[in-house]
């Protein structure tokens, strides 16, 4: 993921003009990185170092989503729909 892609994600999911680190933005960025790394692992199935990094990212995203679900359920639901998560 390059800076341009990251900026687009931040602009799409930010809450206000100066927001770059809210839970919503962090989850969106992690989701993009997870999807990119998943494609990489399909091409390189024996890349175990990247697989471990993927597992860490998935765990971090899960924790952020759990926090968001507790603190702001409406935002959680809209984020899940926008990112097409949870089946």
Swiss-Prot record:
A GO molecular-function annotation: rRNA binding
Q: InterPro entries under this entry?
A: Ribosomal_uS15, Ribosomal_uS15_bac-type, uS15_NS1_RNA-bd_sf
* Any one of the GO CC terms: cytosolic small ribosomal subunit
Q: Which PANTHER family did the record assign?
A: RIBOSOMAL PROTEIN S15, BACTERIAL AND ORGANELLAR, SMALL RIBOSOMAL SUBUNIT PROTEIN US15M
What PROSITE patterns is this protein classified in? RIBOSOMAL_S15
Q: Which domain of life is it from?
A: Bacteria
Single biological process term from Gene Ontology? translation
Query: Quaternary arrangement and interactors, per the entry?
Result: Part of the 30S ribosomal subunit. Forms a bridge to the 50S subunit in the 70S ribosome, contacting the 23S rRNA.
Is Ribosomal protein a UniProt keyword of this protein?
Answer: yes
Family statement drawn from the similarity comment of this UniProt entry: Belongs to the universal ribosomal protein uS15 family.
Organism from which the protein derives: Pseudothermotoga lettingae (strain ATCC BAA-301 / DSM 14385 / NBRC 107922 / TMO) (Thermotoga lettingae)
In terms of NCBIfam families, this protein maps to: S15_bact
Query: CDD domains from the entry?
Result: Ribosomal_S15p_S13e (cd00353)
Q: Which UniProt keywords apply?
A: Ribonucleoprotein, Ribosomal protein, RNA-binding, rRNA-binding
Q: What is the name of this protein?
A: Small ribosomal subunit protein uS15
Give the protein's function: One of the primary rRNA binding proteins, it binds directly to 16S rRNA where it helps nucleate assembly of the platform of the 30S subunit by binding and bridging several RNA helices of the 16S rRNA. Forms an intersubunit bridge (bridge B4) with the 23S rRNA of the 50S subunit in the ribosome.
């Amino acid at each position: 993921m390059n800076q341009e892609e990251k900026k687009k994600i931040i602009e799409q999911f930010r809450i206000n003009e100066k927001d770059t680190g809210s839970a919503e933005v962090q989850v969106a960025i992690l989701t993009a990185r997870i999807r990119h790394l998943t494609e990489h692992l399909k091409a390189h199935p024996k890349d175990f170092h990247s697989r471990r990094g993927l597992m860490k990212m998935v765990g971090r995203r899960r924790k952020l989503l759990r926090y968001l679900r507790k603190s702001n359920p409406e935002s959680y639901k809209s984020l899940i729909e926008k990112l097409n998560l949870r089946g």
